[in-house]
C-alpha cells in the first residue's frame, strides 16, 4: 500500500472526473452509486458452473510486453490457491479494462459492463500493487477498514495528514468469520499517510508489536481464504 500511496500522491487527484472520486486512497467511488453496497454479496462477479469465477479483462495497448507480463503476474498472484481466473475478454459484457491512467486505483466489486482499473506506468506496475487493485475489483476493502479493527490496531490520529483522516474510517464489513490479518496485502502500512514520520497504525497487543503491517508482494493465506469464502468456492488447489 505504501507504493500506491506514493504513486497516487504524486500523480492521481482525489477527483478522477466530475462523477468519480477516490476513497481510502485508491478506491474509485461514483457519486451516483454508493460503494458501501459492495460490502454485501450484491457486487460479486458471477461464478461459473465449474465453480470458478472467470473475470474477463482488456489490457491497454500502451503497455509494453514487459509491463504486460508484470500485470499477468499480479493476476496469477490472485489466482493461485483461489477459484478466480482472469481471462482475456472476447465477448463478455462485464469486464475490467486495465488502463495506464493517472495513479493506481480500482472500483469496488463488480459494477456491470466495463469498469476501469488504473495501473499507471511505471509506478503502479509492481506485482503486489497490481494484485492489491485486483482485490478491490473482486470486492475487498482495506483490512484496517474492518468494523472490529480497534480490537487489533490503534490508529494514531494526531500523526495523520489532516486532509487524509477519512482514509482511516471504519465500515460495516463482512469479515467472513476470518481473523484480523495484519499481513494482508490489503492492509495499510504502519506509516500510511504520516505527516511527521511517526506511525499512523500500530498493533494493539504487546505480542504483535514486531509484526509488519501489510505486504507488497503476494496475497496472504487469509487473503486467499477470503476470496474462496466470499465466492463460496470451497478449498481450491494452486492450479
Place the predicted regions along the sequence by residue:
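Zinc-dependent metalloendopeptidases
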Residues: 1-239
Amino acid at each position: 500500500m505504501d507504493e500506491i500511496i506514493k504513486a497516487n500522491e504524486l500523480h492521481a487527484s482525489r477527483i478522477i472526473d466530475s462523477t468519480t472520486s477516490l476513497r481510502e486512497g485508491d478506491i474509485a467511488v461514483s457519486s451516483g452509486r454508493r460503494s458501501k453496497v459492495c460490502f454485501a454479496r450484491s457486487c460479486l462477479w458471477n461464478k461459473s458452473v465449474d465453480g470458478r469465477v472467470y473475470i474477463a479483462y482488456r489490457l491497454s495497448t500502451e503497455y509494453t510486453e514487459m509491463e504486460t507480463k508484470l500485470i499477468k503476474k499480479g493476476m496469477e498472484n490472485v489466482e493461485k490457491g483461489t477459484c478466480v481466473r482472469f481471462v482475456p475478454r472476447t465477448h463478455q459484457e462485464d469486464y475490467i479494462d486495465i488502463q495506464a491512467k493517472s495513479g493506481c486505483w480500482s472500483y469496488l466489486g463488480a459494477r456491470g459492463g466495463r469498469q476501469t482499473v488504473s495501473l499507471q506506468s511505471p509506478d503502479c506496475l509492481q506485482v503486489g500493487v497490481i494484485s492489491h487493485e485486483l482485490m478491490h475489483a473482486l470486492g475487498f476493502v482495506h483490512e484496517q477498514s474492518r468494523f472490529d479493527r480497534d480490537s487489533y490496531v490503534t490508529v494514531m490520529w494526531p500523526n495523520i495528514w489532516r486532509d487524509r483522516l477519512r482514509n482511516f474510517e471504519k465500515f460495516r464489513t463482512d469479515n467472513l468469520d476470518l481473523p484480523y490479518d495484519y499481513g494482508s496485502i490489503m492492509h495499510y502500512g504502519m506509516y500510511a499517510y504520516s505527516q511527521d514520520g511517526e506511525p499512523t497504525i500500530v498493533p494493539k497487543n504487546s505480542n504483535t508489536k514486531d509484526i509488519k503491517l501489510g505486504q507488497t508482494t503476494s496475497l496472504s493465506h487469509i487473503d486467499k481464504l477470503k476470496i474462496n469464502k466470499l465466492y463460496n468456492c470451497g478449498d481450491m488447489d494452486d492450479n
